[in-house]
């Protein structure tokens, strides 16, 4: 069974997420009509998979009743009155040429047609610019997990983040970097959460007993809501070697926040004890009687990485104490009995990924972990534990030849599905 996915997907972009996503492109293209002079000047802009087309009639001698707008990909047909000067096309394919035709219609017959060739990038610039503004909230960061809250808000869990303003696509090199922040999204408005313990230079969450976040810190995993509690998996990281790639994983903590105030109630270490290559909490799914907690496993972590996915299940009441691990055929309380999930071997799953339910299927979304591949894939299953099938390349990040652009760990946000 194949799906056409239309939820928001946000890849992490370095060095500046806001700079990459906040400018809406407007283009002018020459029109072609049977070697004659064009009868209209056409411009367009795009957001996500929507194309806003506008035009100005340059030949007012033509007699017609209406405009007809079509394209050669989606097979949409729109008809608007002769006094209209714009229209909106949706579900337009991105990162490939699309021919859009503007026709003049008189008495049901087409009298003239102009063709405009467009290519859109598929980026949801409106949501991105709202989520990551140039000032007033988090202005850059990675991670970008999101969790819908019961009152309609969403909380975004960010990793390394900046709060300082961005001017003309640049930020001061002196800006303080937070190891994690939260963004509270409420009907198009955003606010940043940081400063744990009243220290404005502290991240939103800090491991208990830690005073120097340059040596030990939290990077976010995923989370879920149960009742009036928000559960967030935070991975405990430490600087184990010199250089920007010297970070190491230690374990994962579960942070419990009271809703709707987001007051931190308790911090508890996950019950899993095992290899530091197994990172539980990288995806989470609250589904019926069970909470499913997914782990990304580094088999090799180099230029040609190999990674696997494991899953444990528990109940909200036993989240901090008792887990069962999927063995490939059933569930066991022995963590060493866990087996990798079937069907994912063709794509190295990224360090952070998503599993969510969409209608009657489960969806796993990941970005290819190979360095700067730019490929985002989905797999579907009838069960939270797989087997995973229907591999789909749903998006390829454009401009990957730009060596200053580094993308990783794409995230899905199904609560914003159109």
Feature roles, as predicted:
Residues 58-73:
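Solvent-exposed loop/turn segments flanking beta-strands in beta-repeat/beta-sandwich domains
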Residues 23-62, 94, 112-121:
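Pro/Thr/Ser/Gly-rich low-complexity, intrinsically disordered linker/stalk tracts
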Residues 142-145, 208, 212-224, 280-283, ...:
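Beta-propeller and closely related beta-sheet repeat lectin domains
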Residues 89-111:
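Beta-strand-rich modules
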Residues 2-9:
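Bacterial N-terminal signal peptides that target proteins for export
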Residues 22-31, 114-137, 149-216, 225-274, ...:
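Beta-rich carbohydrate-recognition and catalytic domains
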Residues 18-20:
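C-terminal motif of bacterial Sec signal peptides marking the signal peptidase cleavage site
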Residues 77-84:
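Short beta-strand segments within Ig-like beta-sandwich modules, predominantly Fibronectin type-III
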């Amino acid at each position: 069974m194949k799906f056409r996915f239309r939820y928001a997907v946000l890849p992490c972009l370095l060095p500046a997420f806001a700079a990459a996503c906040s400018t809406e492109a407007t283009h002018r293209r020459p029109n072609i009509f049977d070697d004659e002079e064009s009868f209209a000047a056409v411009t367009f802009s795009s957001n996500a998979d929507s194309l806003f087309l506008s035009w100005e009639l340059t030949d007012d001698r033509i007699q017609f009743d209406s405009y007809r707008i079509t394209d050669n990909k989606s097979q949409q047909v729109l008809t608007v009155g002769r006094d209209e000067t714009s229209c909106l096309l949706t579900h337009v394919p991105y990162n490939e040429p699309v021919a859009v035709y503007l026709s003049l219609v008189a008495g049901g017959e087409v009298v003239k047609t102009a063709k405009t060739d467009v290519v859109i990038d598929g980026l949801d610039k409106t949501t991105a610019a709202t989520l990551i503004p140039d000032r007033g909230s988090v202005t850059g960061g990675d991670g970008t997990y999101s969790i819908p809250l019961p009152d309609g808000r969403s909380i975004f869990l960010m990793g390394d983040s900046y709060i300082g303003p961005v001017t003309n696509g640049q930020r001061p090199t002196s800006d303080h970097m937070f190891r994690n922040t939260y963004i509270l999204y409420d009907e198009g408005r955003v606010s940043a959460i940081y400063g744990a313990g009243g220290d404005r230079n502290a991240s939103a969450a800090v491991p208990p007993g830690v005073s120097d976040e340059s040596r030990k810190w939290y990077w976010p995993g995923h989370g879920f809501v149960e009742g009036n509690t928000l559960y967030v998996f935070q991975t405990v990281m430490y600087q184990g070697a010199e250089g920007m790639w010297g970070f190491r994983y230690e374990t994962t903590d579960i942070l419990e926040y009271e809703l709707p105030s987001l007051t931190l109630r308790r911090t508890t270490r996950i019950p899993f004890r095992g290899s530091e290559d197994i990172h539980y909490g990288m995806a989470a799914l609250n589904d019926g009687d069970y909470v499913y907690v997914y782990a990304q496993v580094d088999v090799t972590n180099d230029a040609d990485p190999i990674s696997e996915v494991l899953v444990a299940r528990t109940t909200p009441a036993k989240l901090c104490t008792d887990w069962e691990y999927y063995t490939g055929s059933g569930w066991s309380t022995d963590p060493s009995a866990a087996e990798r999930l079937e069907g994912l071997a063709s794509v190295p799953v990224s360090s952070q990924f998503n599993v969510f339910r969409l209608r009657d299927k489960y969806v796993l979304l990941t970005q290819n972990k190979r360095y700067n591949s730019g490929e985002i894939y989905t797999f579907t299953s009838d069960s939270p534990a797989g087997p995973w099938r229907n591999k789909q390349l749903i998006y390829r990040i454009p401009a990957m030849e730009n060596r200053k652009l580094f993308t990783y760990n794409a995230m899905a946000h199904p609560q914003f599905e159109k």
